[in-house]
Amino acid sequence: MDETKIPKKLQSDDEENISLISSLPFDVDFDSTKLFKYQGCWYDDKTLQGVLNFQRGFEPQDTDIIIASFPKSGTTWLKALTVALLERSKQKHSSDDHPLLLDNPHGLVPFLELRLFTETSKPDLTSISSSPRLFSTHVAFQTLREALKNSPCKIVYVWRNVKDVLVSFWYFNSAKLKIEEERSILDSMFESFCRGVINYGPSWEHVLNYWRASLEDSKNVLFLKYEELKTEPRVQLKRLAEFLDCPFTVEEEERGSVEEILDLCSLRNLKNLEINKTGKTLRGADHKIFFRKGEVGDSKNHLTPEMEKIIDMITEEKFEGSDLKF
C-alpha cells in the first residue's frame, strides 16, 4: 500500500492532519477499512481527524468530567448514571423534563472526537453551559492526557470482558449497517480483535493504561468494572458519586434515591423510553441500537470454545503482572 495516499474525503481537511496521517503506520481491519496507528492505537481516517482536532484544540476546565471507555464496554449506561447523579439536586428522577427522558445519553454526554471535534479543532462549545461539563471519549489514555494539558478534571473509565465487547460490537455493527448478524463477520472481527487492529484497539493496552492511571492518580481517575456495576450496582453507584464529589446523604439513601437512579438508568427502562425507541443521533444512528442485552457472559452463546481459549490466553499474557482479571 502507498502510505502517502490519503482517502479523497480528507483532501479538503486540515493540511496539518493530512500530513501527519500520511506518515503513520497503517493496516486494515475486519472489513478492509484502512486504519492508522497513532500513539499506540488504531483509528480510521475520519475518527483520527477528530482525535487530532480534539488533542490540538480542546480547552479543558478543571471541573470537566470525562467518561472514557473502549467501545461497547458499557459507555451508554455509565453516561446515564452520571447524568442522573448530577441532575438529582435539580429535580426529581420522575420529573417529566428529566434530561434522560428528553435525549439519549450520547446526546447528553457528547463524544469529543466523534462529534464535537470532527470538523475543527475550535468548535463552539458555548452551548455546553452546565458546570461541570460532561464529555466522553474512546481515545487511549496517553492521547487523552495530552489533550487535557495537565488539567485536574475527573476521568471515569469503564472496562468490560473483551469477549462480551467483541460480541456486542458485532451486533452493534450489524444493527448500524442494517444487516443480519453474519457468522463470517464475527469470525473476521475476532481475528482483528486478537491482532489489536480494530478501531481504538488494541483493547488490552487501552484498559491497562487507564488502570495504571487510576493507580497513579486515584483522585482524578476512577476505574470501574462493568461486571461489578452489574453485580453490585448500589455499591458502584455510591462509589461513582463519591468520586464526582456528589455523595449521597443519609437522607437520600433513606428515601431510596440510590434505587431510584438505578431504576431510571436500568437497561429495561432506558430501552423502553420513547426517545430511545424512535430517536436518532446527530450522526444518523438509531438510538435503539445502543440498547441490546447488556448481559455478562453473553459471549458464550456466540464464541466457540477455541475462540474463548485464544482470547483468554491473550488476556493472561497482556495482563501479566497486573491485578486485572476478566
From Swiss-Prot:
For the protein in the UniProt heading, the enzyme class is: transferase
Q: Which InterPro entries match?
A: P-loop_NTPase, Sulfotransferase_dom
Q: Which UniProt keywords apply?
A: Cytoplasm, Transferase
Q: Where does 3'-phosphoadenylyl sulfate bind?
A: 72-77, 160, 168, 226, 292-294
Note the SS bond partners: none
Compartment(s): Cytoplasm
Q: Report if keyword Transferase is assigned.
A: yes
- Entries under Pfam families matching the protein: Sulfotransfer_1 (PF00685)
Active-site residues, Swiss-Prot/TrEMBL: 138 (proton acceptor)
Q: Which GO terms describe its cellular component?
A: cytoplasm
Q: What EC number(s) does this enzyme carry? A: 2.8.2.-
Q: Which domain of life is it from?
A: Eukaryota
Q: Name one GO molecular function term.
A: sulfotransferase activity
Protein family according to the UniProt entry: Belongs to the sulfotransferase 1 family.
Q: What's its job?
A: Sulfotransferase that utilizes 3'-phospho-5'-adenylyl sulfate (PAPS) as sulfonate donor.
Protein name per its UniProtKB record? Cytosolic sulfotransferase 7
Provenance organism: Arabidopsis thaliana
Organism taxonomic ancestry: Eukaryota, Viridiplantae, Streptophyta, Embryophyta, Tracheophyta
